[in-house]
Amino acid sequence: MTDLPPHALQPAEPVSVEQHMALSSLFTTLEDLTAWSRKHSLWPFNFGLSCCYVEQVTALTPVYDQARFGAEVIRASPRQADLLVVSGTVFHKMAAPLLRLYEQMRAPRWVIAMGACACSGGMYDIYSVVQGVDRFIPVDVYIPGCPPRPEAMLDALIMLQQQVGSERRPLGVTVGNSAGLGFDAPRRRDERHDQRMAQTLLDPPETL
């Protein structure tokens, strides 16, 4: 027979109904529950342009384990993502495609600018480089450095999670008129359908 301490042989004290409810029930509001779920289930879409992207993907390795923060599901399409991570030098040629990718993301959406080039243009103060990605899309968290370490990416995720968890959005953002998930805003695909179908000439690449 295994030797047990004397208190282990004593019968457990009965648990009251109030104590049982406190241990097994959760009381919250829909806004708080929505913010909590968004905070711990960010779906990033990586837009890597240069050396900072190497440090960004390093944060996904087992050494740093970005999965601890619920942001390891890298999406291949911006339509399935709510977090855009821009890392590297943003040239003017890439500004228009990057803006289109941002517009394709479903709201609510957030942006992280990783590296000095994405934050402010870095050392490239020249005509061909955008001096900060916030010139044409809003940025929520900036990660300075050339390049920043993977730990900085994890710190940015923590800061963004705190920001997302503190946001309180109206119920209409979560539950539409038909009680289904989604937004009541019209889709850009539907808005531009007639215009795209009537277009017969394509713009040259240098005008984009």
Swiss-Prot record:
Write down any Gene Ontology CC term.
Answer: plasma membrane
Q: Its membrane topology, per UniProt?
A: Peripheral membrane protein
Provide the cofactor note recorded for this chain's UniProt entry.
Binds 1 [4Fe-4S] cluster.
Biological process (GO) annotations held by this record are:
aerobic respiration; electron transport coupled proton transport
Q: Which reaction does it catalyse?
A: a quinone + NADH + 5 H(+)(in) = a quinol + NAD(+) + 4 H(+)(out)
Q: Which cofactor does it need?
A: [4Fe-4S] cluster
Its quaternary organisation is: NDH-1 is composed of 14 different subunits. Subunits NuoB, C, D, E, F, and G constitute the peripheral sector of the complex.
The record's listing under NCBIfam families reads:
nuoB_fam, PRK06411.1
**UniProt protein name:** NADH-quinone oxidoreductase subunit B
Q: What lineage is this protein's organism placed in?
A: Bacteria, Pseudomonadati, Pseudomonadota, Alphaproteobacteria, Hyphomicrobiales
